[in-house]
């Protein structure tokens, strides 16, 4: 009986040591510790700033850092990529809106807007694997993140927009989340979440289970679409993010969450990236393989 008591006590002590950190956008600052400000349009005032102070958005006492305009080139103040913050409470098709009209806490509350630059990811020589990554202060185990459709992207998926055509039930738009090391290299497994698949679109905040990922120094975010042209993806590559949770210990969420949250598995077969979902295989562009 005493042995059982001491075993349970030791197990409880180990469990109690685990610490979870959830993204808190109210703590967001620049590199110098100054609080992030929003302009009259309810977006981060420094969204188009290439100043070094805004290369990362620091949250949770710098335990979670979001990349912003990592290339340092805003093309004269008219371009941005990576992550920015928004408090927009509308859903009109704007790039800084999400279909939920706000973060997890409700309409008008802050959320993260991501814009993935395929051009930067494929051509940069800065040592970063993507325009969109979240860096941790040390190695953590990812637990979960909430993803929501961008209003601008949903408009394109439904109606077409500029060079982007409307989606059919054969099209897919996927967000690929992968762990990174301290050298910003992608390592280990990936989680693939579909913003559009089988004629269905993300219509609000959905939890994505990240517990299959190993301990890492951060996360990279990439996007793929079946609508591509000579210059790459035609579909607007925006997405919204909130509620990222990381832990000092491995999180076991159970097999029942795999189908609903992970959505798909990424595998490398004969040098080709394949995505497996519901017994089907897709290539990296999201095309169904027979």
Task: For every predicted segment, state its role.
Residues 19-130, 137:
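N-terminal targeting leaders for non-cytosolic proteins
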Residues 4-13:
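Sec-dependent N-terminal signal peptides
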Residues 248-275:
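Residue-level detector of functionally pivotal "anchor" positions at catalytic/ligand-binding pockets or at interdomain
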Residues 25-27, 172-251:
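Terminal, low-complexity interaction segments
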Residues 156-175:
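Short coil-to-beta strand junction motifs in C2/discoidin
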Residues 1-4, 18-19:
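Positively charged n-region of N-terminal signal peptides that target proteins for export
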Residues 282-287:
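Short, glycine-anchored, charge-dense loop/turn motifs used at functional sites
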Residues 137-144, 215-216:
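Extended extracellular/luminal ectodomain segments enriched in beta-structured repeat modules
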């Amino acid at each position: 009986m005493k042995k059982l008591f001491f075993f349970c006590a030791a197990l409880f002590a180990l469990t109690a040591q685990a610490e979870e950190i959830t993204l808190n956008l109210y703590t967001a600052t620049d590199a110098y510790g100054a609080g992030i400000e929003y302009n009259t349009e309810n977006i981060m005032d420094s969204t188009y700033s290439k100043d070094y102070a805004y290369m990362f958005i620091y949250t949770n006492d710098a335990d979670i850092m979001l990349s912003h305009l990592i290339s340092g080139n805003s093309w004269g103040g008219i371009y941005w990529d990576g992550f920015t913050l928004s408090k927009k409470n509308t859903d009109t098709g704007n790039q800084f809106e999400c279909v939920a009209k706000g973060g997890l806490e409700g309409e008008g509350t802050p959320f993260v807007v991501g814009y993935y630059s395929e051009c930067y990811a494929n051509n940069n020589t800065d040592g970063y694997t993507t325009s969109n990554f979240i860096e941790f202060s040390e190695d953590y185990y990812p637990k979960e993140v909430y993803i929501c459709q961008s209003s601008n992207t949903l408009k394109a998926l439904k109606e077409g927009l500029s060079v982007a055509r409307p989606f059919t039930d054969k099209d897919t738009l996927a967000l690929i989340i992968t762990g990174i090391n301290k050298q910003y290299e992608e390592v280990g497994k990936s989680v693939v979440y579909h913003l559009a698949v089988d004629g269905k679109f993300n219509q609000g905040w959905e939890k994505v289970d990240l517990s299959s990922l190993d301990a890492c120094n951060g996360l990279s975010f990439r996007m793929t679409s079946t609508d591509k042209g000579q210059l790459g993806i035609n579909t607007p590559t925006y997405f919204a993010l909130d509620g990222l949770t990381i832990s000092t210990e491995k999180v076991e969420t159970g097999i029942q969450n795999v189908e609903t949250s992970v959505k798909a598995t990424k595998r490398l077969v004969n040098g080709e990236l394949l995505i497996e979902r519901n017994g089907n295989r897709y290539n990296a562009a999201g095309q169904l393989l027979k």
